[in-house]
Each structure stands twice: as C-alpha cells, then as structure tokens.
C-alpha cells in the first residue's frame, strides 16, 4: 500500500512540471497520394498524324499503344479513345490499330473537347501533333486553366521527334497542304507530343517511368507545369547561424513542423539553411535573380489560427558558388513587427519564381517555327508556334496558382 501511495505522489509531482500547450491543427494543405487511379489515353485520329506510322526507322510513335498501356496499367484501369472533332471509345484491343495509317481519317481535331471531357481524378494523356490555330489553342489553355490549374493539378508535355512521311495540313496563312518526308535523317524527324494532365504525383511518376523506358535515340523534350518545383522538406533541414531562436517542443507538434522559442521578443531573429535544388523531370529553367517571397503568419485565437495583417519576414536565396544547385536560404524577422506576443504563431514562407523567372526549356524554342504566310518557309521538322503555345500554357498557370521552389513552415511558441 505504501508503494502505491508513493507512486501516486511521484506521478502527481511529475504532472506539475512544464504545461503542454495545445494549438488548433496547423493550416497546411493535405498531401494525398492515391495508390491506384485510372488512366485515359486519347489518340489524335486526324489525317496529319498518319505520317508518323509510315516509316519504321526509329519509330517511337508506333510503340505508344502498348508502351502507354504497359506504363499506366499497374496503377489501375487504362481506357483508350480516339478523337477528331468528336471523341470515340476504343474497345478491346482496337487501340492497337493506331499503329497503322488506315485509322487516321478525321479532318478536324479538337483537343479542347478532350480537355473538357477529361476526368480530373484520372491521369489523362493526349497524343497529338499540337497543330492548333491560335484561337483553338486559346480555348484549350482556358479549359486547362479552369479545370486543372485552378484545382491545383499538374500539366506536362512530352515532345518526341519521330520519323515521318505524309501530309501536313493548314500550313501558313493560306492553310496549304504540305507533303513532308523525314526519310531516315534524325535531323528531319517531326515532333509529336503527349499532353499529360492529372494529380501532381501521377504526372511526375509518369514522366519518370517514360524517361526510363526510352530506348530509341529519338530526341525527347520534357515540359512540366507544377505547383511543387521541389519536394524539399524543411522539417528535415539542419539550421545554421541561428540568432534569437531556440528549438522548442512545448507544443509537441508532429514531425512535419519545426518549433522554435525566442530568447528575447524585442530582438531580431534569424536562421539559415542549406538547400539543394533538385528539379523534377521537365521543370522549367529558373532565373534565380527573379524569385519572390510570400510570407504569411497566423496567430492562435481560441480554436482558430487568425492571419496577421502585417509582418516583416524576409527570406533570401543566396547562391553557394561551390555547387551549381546549392543555395543558402536565410530567414529573418522582427518579433515585435511580425508575431503576436504571448501566443503561438505559425509562419508560412513560400519562395517562388516570378512569371518571367520561369523560362521555357531550350528545346521548345528549338522545335518551334513561325510561318509568315510563305509555304517555302515551313520546316516540317518543327511545330508551328510551339513556343507561343507552351508559353501561353505557362502563363495561364500563373493566373490561378504560383509554383513554389521552397516552402518553409515553422511555429514560434509563446
């Protein structure tokens, strides 16, 4: 009985130590990754695509029906469709007919109709030559912006230069027909494209697997528009040159969030971290002189986190000359100007490229041609106005969402 009484006293005394404070759930977006999802693959069945099937040399295009089905089949069901102006389902193994010229009979193509039909819970892959008028493509980008970018989904384009012998339509101001043969010259190969739309993890995973499965020597370009240019996890970073912050765990947050206390509320506080930029496949080149910081601070008020109207948080990326992809990120703030004294404060910092700081990949410009109306100026190894088409797609992302390079989240305990 005495031992039990003594244990009760010890537990009571131990419970009278430092009080664990509780805070509402941290306002972070939930990252959900579905293990399975369906894939919808759409083949452009217009006559201008026929030429990709006629020359067997280094022909990636004729491998696509089986290759795409194989790459996507492990994640869930794979559904095949053909399209011109309308969309039609391909039952059974009829999708394999798209390796032969005979099925390419459609006169009009409408990528916009495919985007409108696309199921945002699926991965959608559109196989096309991106031969769209400015007006048609403007409608496509509008649909993608409203349906995918506004829903925080990801869009990618894969370009593959392929042997080609056939007709190309609507060339120049006179909308002329153009006969083109690449023969067996890789420098004359004509590009076709995969337009890929869906959840961020699904799109990035597809790009990785497609890149790994590329065995032919055909030139291939990748273009990715994602809100997450880096998967770096700040909670795992080692801090250096820490001023007026100390590690704290009185709030007992989960491992995703770093927690700090302040030595003195009246003094400036700062820290630095090393960060290595590891871009995903297809990420646009970045001008690191054109990045900007968005800082938000939320203070606990009862059961809620309320945003503070003003703060002086500063975050700077400093280039480390020892390695091209290595940076120092310095974060600083003045507690009296940024934090609510005596309350828990959640600090969310996003470092993002500006619209001009996110550049088109070099291959996009190299594969693009402008035709001023003279058919003689057309180059069948390139795509008309490709840089303008993909540039407008990039710009449309910035109208609804901002891609981030690095996100730094931490809580300052009272």
Task: Give the ranges of each region predicted by the language model.
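Positively charged n-region of N-terminal signal peptides that target proteins for export
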Residues: 1-4, 18
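…and closely analogous acidic/polar surface helices at protein-protein or active-site interfaces
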Residues: 27-29, 36-37, 47-77, 139-151
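Extended non-globular C-terminal regions
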Residues: 240-414
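Extracytoplasmic/secreted cell-surface and envelope-processing proteins
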Residues: 20-24, 49-54, 87-93, 132-141, ...
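Eukaryote-biased recognition of electropositive, low-complexity segments
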Residues: 156-278, 283
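Von Willebrand factor
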Residues: 77-125, 132-136, 159-168
């Amino acid at each position: 009985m005495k031992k039990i009484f003594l244990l009760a006293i010890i537990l009571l005394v131990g419970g009278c130590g430092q009080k664990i404070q509780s805070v509402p759930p941290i306002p972070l977006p939930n990252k959900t990754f579905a293990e399975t999802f369906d894939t919808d693959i759409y083949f452009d069945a217009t006559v201008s695509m026929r030429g990709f099937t006629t020359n067997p040399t280094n022909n990636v295009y004729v491998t696509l029906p089986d290759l795409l089905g194989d790459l996507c089949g492990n994640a869930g069901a794979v559904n095949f469709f053909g399209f011109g102006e309308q969309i039609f389902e391909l039952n059974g193994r009829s999708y394999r007919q798209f390796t032969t010229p005979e099925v390419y009979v459609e006169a009009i193509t409408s990528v916009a109709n495919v985007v409108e039909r696309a199921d945002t819970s699926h991965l959608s892959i559109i196989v096309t030559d991106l031969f769209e008028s400015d007006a048609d493509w403007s409608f496509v980008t509008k649909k993608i912006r409203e349906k995918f970018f506004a829903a925080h989904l990801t869009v990618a384009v894969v370009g593959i230069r392929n042997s080609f012998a056939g007709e190309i339509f609507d060339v120049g101001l006179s909308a002329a027909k153009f006969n083109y043969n690449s023969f067996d010259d890789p420098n004359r190969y004509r590009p076709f494209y995969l337009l890929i739309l869906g959840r961020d993890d699904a799109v990035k995973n597809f790009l990785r697997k497609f890149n790994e499965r590329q065995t032919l020597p055909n030139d291939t370009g990748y273009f990715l528009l994602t809100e997450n240019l880096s998967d770096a996890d700040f909670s795992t970073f080692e801090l250096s040159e820490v001023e007026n912050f100390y590690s704290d765990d009185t709030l007992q947050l989960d491992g995703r969030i770093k927690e700090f206390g302040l030595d003195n509320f009246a003094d400036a506080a700062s820290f630095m971290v090393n960060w290595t930029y590891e871009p995903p496949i297809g990420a646009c080149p970045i001008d690191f002189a054109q990045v900007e910081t968005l800082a938000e601070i939320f203070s606990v008020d009862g059961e809620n986190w309320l945003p503070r109207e003003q703060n002086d948080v500063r975050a700077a990326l400093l280039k480390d000359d020892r390695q091209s992809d290595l940076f120092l990120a310095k974060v600083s703030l003045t507690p009296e100007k940024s934090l609510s004294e005596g309350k828990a404060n959640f600090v969310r910092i996003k470092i993002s490229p500006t619209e001009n700081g996110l550049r088109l990949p070099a291959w996009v410009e190299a594969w693009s041609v402008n035709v001023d109306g003279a058919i003689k100026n057309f180059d069948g190894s390139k795509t008309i106005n490709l840089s303008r088409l993909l540039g407008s797609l990039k710009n449309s992302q910035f109208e609804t969402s901002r891609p981030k390079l690095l996100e730094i989240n931490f809580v300052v305990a009272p």
